[in-house]
Every structure is written in structure tokens, then in C-alpha cells.
Swiss-Prot record:
Highest taxon above the source species: Bacteria
Protein name (database record): Large ribosomal subunit protein bL34
Protein species of origin: Streptomyces griseus subsp. griseus (strain JCM 4626 / CBS 651.72 / NBRC 13350 / KCC S-0626 / ISP 5235)
PANTHER family in UniProt: LARGE RIBOSOMAL SUBUNIT PROTEIN BL34M, MITOCHONDRIAL RIBOSOMAL PROTEIN 34 FAMILY MEMBER
Similarity comment: family membership: Belongs to the bacterial ribosomal protein bL34 family.
BP-aspect Gene Ontology terms: translation
This protein's UniProt keywords: Ribonucleoprotein, Ribosomal protein
PROSITE patterns: RIBOSOMAL_L34 (PS00784)
Amino acid sequence: MSKRTFQPNNRRRAKTHGFRLRMRTRAGRAILANRRGKGRSSLSA
């Protein structure tokens, strides 16, 4: 039997998909702008 692939880890989640990571690059800021435009309640992890 192989193990489950999703092993939740809040710190890794934030480091990979977090708000500060999104703000770092132009593409990431574009993602946030799109999500704001769509009216998402949660912008990032």
C-alpha cells in the first residue's frame, strides 16, 4: 500500500501558496487582482 499523497502542513502551505509569496511577483499580484475582481472571500492560503 502506498501512502496518501496529501500530508497537510500549514507552514508549507503558506510558504508555497501564501499571500506574501503572491505579492512577490508580478504574476502573483495578477492572481490576487483576478481573485479580488471575482469577489473571492479568501484571496490566498
